[in-house]
Each structure stands twice: as C-alpha cells, then as structure tokens.
Amino acid sequence: KWDMNRIFSDYYSKNLPPERQGEMAHRYVCGLYHCMRELTKRFPDILFEGCSAGGNRFDLGILCYFPQIWASDNTDALCRTQIQYNYSYGYPLSCISAHVSASPNHQTLRNMPLETRFAVAAFGNLGYEFNLCDLPKDEFMAVKAQIELYKKWREVIQYGTFYRRECFDNRNSRNHGVLNNGAGNNAS
C-alpha cells in the first residue's frame, strides 16, 4: 500500500515566485505519476495499492498504476457504507479496497456483527484487517465461509452492473446490488 497520510496545507515553494505558487499541487501529481510509472515498470509483478487518505490520491490517473485504492482509513462498517456508496458513483467496485475490521471498531468503538462487516466490505476488493489467529473457532470458520462465498461471486460483484436504489432516509440507508451481465461468474 502506497500511503501518504498527510494533508496538503502548504501548497507553496520557496523556489517559485508568487505568481507560480499555484503549480505545487499539479507538480506533486506529475511527480507521483512519474514515480509510479518507474516503479510499476521495474516491478511489474508487484500489485501496488494506492491510498486516498492524506494525499487524496484516488483519481482516474492513479488507476493506471494502482488498480486498487484504499478508499478511507475509516473501517467502521456503517461509515463505509457511505464512503463506498459515494465512491461507486465515479469508480468501479473492483478498484475500491474494503476490509472487514475488528469489532468494536478501533475508530468509532461501534460493535457490528461479523456478517454485517463482511456484507459491506464484499462490495469492493475484499480484505480482512485483524489477526485471524485471535478469532474464536466459530468466527474463524465464518470468515473462511465468507471468503469462499466472495470468491464464488467476486467477478459478478467487481465487474457486473452496479445499481443503486435511492432510499427515503438517504442519511442512514444504503441499498444497492450487482447484476450479472456476463461478467464470467462461475457461481451456480
């Protein structure tokens, strides 16, 4: 994961005159793309994951180098419904990294069932963000079953046609689904 956890607040350079200070953000992006082009050329077998946090690097250009992007450092399942839903307006589910994290969530302290956390993370590039060795046997087996289910439906989820249904209470509800449009699903 290529991360830059830094907020851009100092868009200036001592080396540029005042009338050219507006170039800093653009120069940063050009430099980052150059760096990523070289890295992916030198190491074509490494899957680099980008990160939108800090440097706000989730755009169509960066997808040339990072086929998947960590959409937010916030891993709370309820918060992620909004984050992933909004990203889906501009990006395919296949590039949105989404993880099942521990409960209670370390950021919001919210308790969510494992099934809920999986259901949210499954609408993206699924991962798990906790130590599997720490799980009770029943949860470990549930995670194993979730991964098998995801693998069965991964192509449909990532490459099918994504539909959103607008809800009356848009603040607390998300309703969406994926239709198999010949995406190569081997599921029965």
Identify the role of each PLM range.
Residues 169-188:
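Carbohydrate-binding surface patches
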Residues 9, 13, 20, 40-47, ...:
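Hydrophobic alpha-helix feature that most strongly marks membrane-spanning transmembrane helices
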Residues 115-167:
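Catalytic cores of secreted or luminal carbohydrate-active enzymes
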Residues 2-8, 52-57:
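Short, solvent-exposed turn/loop segments enriched in Gly/Ser/Thr/Pro and often Arg
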Residues 1, 11-12, 130-131:
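Extended hydrophobic-aromatic, low-complexity segments
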Residues 24-28, 62-65, 84, 142-157:
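Charged, low-complexity, helix-prone segments enriched in Lys/Glu/Asp/Gln
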Residues 26-134:
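Glycan-recognition surfaces
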Residues 6-33, 78:
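Aromatic- and acidic-residue-enriched carbohydrate-binding clefts of CAZyme catalytic domains
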